């Protein structure tokens, strides 16, 4: 990568700017430029696309995204200590990198980017799930074409989980309802500085033209939240606040009231959401 952008290795960048990952910000820096380049390639053809990156840190993945031909990268970094390192990346790629010192949860990113838009990020562990839920819950089709995101491996496994598995839950349902998520890369702790206690994984989400099964998004969100908040209870108990005669509602949707949330397929949850919505 240094041969492409003329910038030094990331370990030198971190040393030069006195950077260290902050646990309270969910930071773990990925320093291997071969890996950051691979993640950028796993996002697909970036030429002609604007790319949103959240939590760029010292800019390793940012460099990969620019080298892969992203038309423009918007990098949102909450930690002001990383800004000088990112400014060096911006200088190496004039006019193609905008760095925003802000909290990604508070930024209207769609208004700052031009379609087609792809989101590629090594997400800070403390906000990754919340950001994903927001991006999946927006109107459909969403403002983005695809998501390529790094999570803790345990979170990635929850995203692609199937009914009946221990990892299966609301995150799997929301992800699989309108996208095709796939784990495309697993990384060991030693790939990061400092090494986290767990493995990490990259998930690529291909958006679908529409939902797999019809349902109102708000109702489906409410039903799944109630069901999985008490996942070990029978649905007639966990969903009793959903309707006066919840057992009849469940049976009308083809669901046995004694079933538990982890046993229901996405199709069954959508059928229940339609029945609740009337």
Curated annotation (Swiss-Prot):
One of its GO terms (molecular function) is 16S rRNA (adenine(1518)-N(6)/adenine(1519)-N(6))-dimethyltransferase activity. CDD domains: AdoMet_MTases. NCBIfam families: ksgA. Signal peptide: none annotated. S-adenosyl-L-methionine binds at residues 28, 30, 55, 77, 103, 122. InterPro entries: KsgA/Erm, rRNA_Ade_diMease-like_C, rRNA_Ade_Mease_Trfase_CS, rRNA_Ade_methylase_Trfase_N, rRNA_adenine_dimethylase, SAM-dependent_MTases_sf. PANTHER family: DIMETHYLADENOSINE TRANSFERASE, DIMETHYLADENOSINE TRANSFERASE-RELATED. Belongs to the class I-like SAM-binding methyltransferase superfamily. rRNA adenine N(6)-methyltransferase family. RsmA subfamily. Keywords: Cytoplasm, Methyltransferase, RNA-binding, rRNA processing, S-adenosyl-L-methionine, Transferase. It holds the Pfam family RrnaAD. It is an enzyme of class 2 (transferase). The keyword Ubl conjugation does not apply. It comes from the Bacteria. It comes from Cereibacter sphaeroides (strain ATCC 17025 / ATH 2.4.3) (Rhodobacter sphaeroides). The keyword Protein biosynthesis does not apply. This is Ribosomal RNA small subunit methyltransferase A. GO terms for cellular component: cytosol. Specifically dimethylates two adjacent adenosines (A1518 and A1519) in the loop of a conserved hairpin near the 3'-end of 16S rRNA in the 30S particle. May play a critical role in biogenesis of 30S subunits. It is found in: Cytoplasm. It catalyses: adenosine(1518)/adenosine(1519) in 16S rRNA + 4 S-adenosyl-L-methionine = N(6)-dimethyladenosine(1518)/N(6)-dimethyladenosine(1519) in 16S rRNA + 4 S-adenosyl-L-homocysteine + 4 H(+). Its EC number is 2.1.1.182.
